[in-house]
Amino acid sequence: MSEPLGAWLRGVGLWSLGYPSFPAWVDAGMPEDLDPAGDQAPGKPSADLLHPRLRRRTSLLTRMIVTALAEAAGQGGAAHEQTRYIVVSSWGEIETTVDLLRQLAVPGGPISPTAFHNSVHNTATGYLSIASGNHWPSTALAAGPHALEIGLLEALAGLRAAEGPADALLILAEERLPAPFTRADADPSFALALHLARAPGRATHPSSLDLRIELRDSPSASAELVALDTLPSLVRTIQPLLRAIAAGSGHAAIALAQQLDAPPNRAGVERTWTLHLHES
Amino acid sequence: MPGRLPITAYSACNGLGTTTEAVLDSLFAGRRGLVHVAEEYGVSTWIGEVPGPLPALSAALSSFESRQARIAQLVTLPMLDAIEQTKRRWGAGRVALILGTSTAGIAESERAWIHQRDHASLPAGFAIERQHALHATVEVVRALTGVRGPGYVVSTACSSSGKVFASARRLIEAGIVDAALVGGVDSLCQMTLRGFAGLEVLSAEPCRPFSSERRGINIGEGAALLLVERGRHPSQGEFDHLGVELLGVGESSDAHHMTAPHPEGTGARMAMQRAIEAAGLEPSDIDQINVHGTGTSMNDATESRAIRDLFGPERSQGDLALVATKGYTGHMLGAAGATEAVFVLASIQRSLLPAGVGCDPIDASLGVHVNQTLRARASQRVLSNSLAFGGSNVSVLLGASE
């Protein structure tokens, strides 16, 4: 890379069944498990950005994404109609998809048109653009164990391109794999939103984090190894980044992807990146 | 100003054939690649199905078994020599792998769901991350090619494999990679056939884009891959390519409705406009458009409106050549954008416009003229549109090398 890709991290949002915001997770001692602790009841994402008429048709995934995104955008001051949305998820709208599999198992049976159009990977970005009148391009990606790295590459390369908006909201989100595809190693339901921008925001939004981030090629980055036949965990991948944001000071260098362990049938990647995060 | 990115190789398979040669021969001979759907789907329509038994996966890839993976392998193997050259030119880690898909291997999960209902367990060997996951298609192509740069899937329904060109262009311009293997892979499944039937847009007959007798869409499967590269190597200078370059890409969101396009074609117009601007050109520089042209009354009306608004009523019925190809392949959904980019590329290389099968009689109320018969035409700059659920639009601009 000629010069490192960089941006300002202005806001963060987190929503999981156990923690309804980033501060709630920090206050709880930054637990690795994002599900409710002990006998705590699971929360419900408010997804206030969506009109109730739209909201009632949406899945947990879409509501989590909208809720986390509103938190990040509010902190750093992202205008919803002037932002590029990037969603990265391995399973996407998996609850809606599995409900459709149940409908499809009945030969000749009816298929819900709403469930069908809500099963696409870009469902959340579609609803978000409708709710905010946003005509900028958005995208929905899947990158397996490289979700965080790929999301940052897309977001930062997009901010650098002349033709896009000056703000990006990067969202990493999963719904827990439902039956019959349940897996002990699957990620819990959660959404993480990061507001990334060409310029810092504190001048107009005092709560803006204004952490400078840079992506650097690092061939030797010691990414965590994932055993074959184990699902890579996005929740584990994002932990160092969440902790560095919570610390909010000094300098942190974060490896971005999990590597699959010695895979006989999975060719590895050669490029790895480290995310450098520091105070302005 | 962003550079022009030459295309060095391409490959396609779909209802027209299993090899690029067979696909393009059929396209320029005006032969449809559609067949009546098998009874098991419980719907009456025509589909574009990759013909014949698909070759088995190589032993190393057997755990990825799925129709999706077999189609991915079929389209990738003819590209291996070209990919080796690209890897040698830039380094395997400097080549990205960006694929569009909407279905991925969902057909395998359809069978798995029924298996667990009947046997209280998933089928032996079924792993959701290899049979069904979007990302599995990238792993299959990565394993076959040894491309080692960033690899991911864009899944924005029917615009997926048009938007891969935008991602590739951004990564190359940001200096992250020097080349990208881009494309799309989609495979037939109950989900899309019966889902679109539920939306009441499936045509019981071969589809008729832009015809006054259009009755909806046909679903197709298949794949296309293209190698896009930085124009000039710092030490080796220029290198051999196909004489066609990626000039620009435009993307937009309708911000209107999950399934219905904006009635005024706003998003489609913005996508075309942004592609033209990204290339530093004017609408008057464009001489051909491969339309999205699904054959639904709504798509064709709003896309026509967008074209008329951007290029003017005269050019839309005059010297602007409009080509609709879904009558050949059906709507290949997540593979449509890359497939139609290959059609555009072949059209520029051969200086030929393919005939518009099924487009006759043209719906005069649309105010645009779609090409109907095979004819000679030396187009220099061609847009290819893909418009999707969620209001996700993309227009890819390809041009002859100057």
List each model region and its residues:
Chain B
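Conserved active-site "lid/cap" helical segment
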Residues: 21-99, 105-106, 271-283
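Active-site-proximal gating segment of KS-fold condensing enzymes and close homologs
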Residues: 101-152, 299-314
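Condensing-enzyme catalytic core mediating Claisen C-C bond formation in acyl metabolism
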Residues: 4-8, 13, 25-46, 206-279, ...
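Active-site pocket-shaping loop/turn-to-helix segments
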Residues: 59-80, 123-133, 151-163, 208-224, ...
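Active-site-proximal alpha-helical scaffold in enzymes
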Residues: 80, 134, 142-145, 150-183, ...
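ACP-dependent fatty acid/polyketide chain-elongation machinery
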Residues: 1-64, 101, 231-245, 342-357, ...
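Acyl-CoA/ACP chain-elongation machinery
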Residues: 176-198, 203-214, 249-263, 291-301, ...
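Conserved small-residue
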Residues: 9, 27, 79, 97, ...
